[in-house]
Amino acid sequence: MPTTFHEIPRKRPTTPLLDRANTPDGLRRLGEAELETLADELRLELLYTVGQTGGHFGAGLGVIELTIALHYVFDTPDDRLVWDVGHQAYPHKILTGRRERMETLRQKDGIAAFPRRSESEYDTFGVGHSSTSISAALGMAIAARLQNSDRKAIAVIGDGALTAGMAFEALNHAPEVDANMLVILNDNDMSISRNVGGLSNYLAKILSSRTYASMREGSKKVLSRLPGAWEIARRTEEYAKGMLVPGTLFEELGWNYIGPIDGHDLPTLIATLRNMRDLKGPQFLHIVTKKGKGFAPAEVDPIGYHAITKLEPLDAPAAAPKKAGGPKYSGVFGEWLCDMAAADPRLVGITPAMKEGSDLVAFSERFPLRYFDVAIAEQHAVTLAAGMACEGAKPVVAIYSTFLQRGYDQLVHDVAVQNLDVLFAIDRAGLVGEDGPTHAGSFDLSFLRCIPGMVIMTPSDENELRKMLTTGHLYNGPAAVRYPRGTGPNATIEKDLEPIEIGKGVVRRQGSKVALLVFGVQMAEALKVAETLDATVVDMRFVKPMDEALVREIANSHDLLVTIEENAIMGGAGGAVSEFLARENILKSVLHLGLPDVYVEHAKPAQMLAECGLDEVGIEAAVRERLELLNR
């Protein structure tokens, strides 16, 4: 069984077996008796690597044995291995030729936090969002059949990801086309897994064997000729298996269910996977693992060790006092939610599995009957809110920008068309740093702005966020407040619950010739640039309805308008300004600054903003360049 480690090594560990198994070909040259030692070395290497870079932690520790078994049994990359979400894929990266590059994990120009097709042939499908693996692997299995190939398709999905409807859509479809594929349920929640042990492991070996499969198919042919006999036999088999395994649901959908088995028992994993590799049709293997396995602190606190920051060197010089910063925007939201809930009993809070990330912990404890975590089910979260709003509740949907994309139809069809009172608190808007393009909130202004009746707000600091949340809550109709990851500029927060006037911007600095129209948190950078250029700075506040009277006034008194937003330029807030000017036949030079028409790769947030020209240096340079053109 796995060795348990108690601290993260600060020096690279000695790993003689892992040194020979940097690729799956090297791994397959090892003897089975060596694999458990390899698992200890790989776990130690993962502890060291993530300690150096920071990153997702607990999930990878929990699939060390599974990763080894999959690459040992299957002919990757010819056999297609698809990881769901990708939090658990660091051991996979180490074993597929990227060990020496793990020092660059999640850094600019380094390897990504998630599997990427452009990074390795072993990364067969790019992931980041949850619950896509079964659909992708099914598509690969169907393509293999059309190409007369016998390559395998394997999806590894966690029990949390199975809460999403998309996963069940794929589970329902695969038996309809009799796909030759394997789904592995990595169950690390322990909620449906009490039957793990020697008997269950033994049963899994029997049920996954060729002998059992042949006997089952032969019996089916014979008994199918006898009226009622096959149905009796099928029910008897289900009853016998059901006493030991929780797989009836998957069997009813048409999958050959095996398990649950201990996901840290390498010999059993390898034997079971070898048996299942040769079976035809849709196969489902249920394994039970422990998130953070092999690192004692993570086993005790798997949520706290979901991801970690990098270790500071032991000999690091004393750090300078940190510059005072404001609270996290998510923290401001969480405090407001509790305050408003105390003032308004109609308020309910909804989140799709982001209680900690969106800062709903305090709300869930103070108002447990008004708190709803719907798990990874964004579509359901939005329509649930719509149903509540129909009955007089005031739902607040706390959701990351990137995940709101999954509930877009529900936002339009179920909320906006009916003009329901639902407030969307959109966290992680804009660039998010090391998690890269799959998690960036680059598009919400673009896809929200076109929805009739939607009020869209972009706070420039913590106090503005609190006021806008109140404004959205009191508005009779759908509203959205989008705010970034990280901390604010430490603005003074007014504790009252007073709204601001909808559709009204504010001039923060009066200048001449150049006007910077800011939608969001680039206000601090804009004010610094304005001091150098003597520019006017406008806090636009509202993307929709936009303060058209203020835009007209500014356009008539300045030579150049510069819109600034941390959203895609295409379809974004700046576009609303240009559309208004064109509609009013106001001819004015407008410069749009925002996210370019590319996926911005992972890096530190400051590096990403600089790359996009949204830091102080980039904004000033772009404005000066445009002024030079105007002055020619």
UniProtKB/Swiss-Prot annotation:
Pathway: Metabolic intermediate biosynthesis; 1-deoxy-D-xylulose 5-phosphate biosynthesis; 1-deoxy-D-xylulose 5-phosphate from D-glyceraldehyde 3-phosphate and pyruvate: step 1/1. It is an enzyme of class 2 (transferase). Residues 1-25 are annotated as: Disordered. It catalyses: D-glyceraldehyde 3-phosphate + pyruvate + H(+) = 1-deoxy-D-xylulose 5-phosphate + CO2. NCBIfam families: dxs, PRK05444.2-2. Belongs to the transketolase family. DXPS subfamily. This is 1-deoxy-D-xylulose-5-phosphate synthase. The lineage of its organism: Bacteria, Pseudomonadati, Pseudomonadota, Gammaproteobacteria, Pseudomonadales.
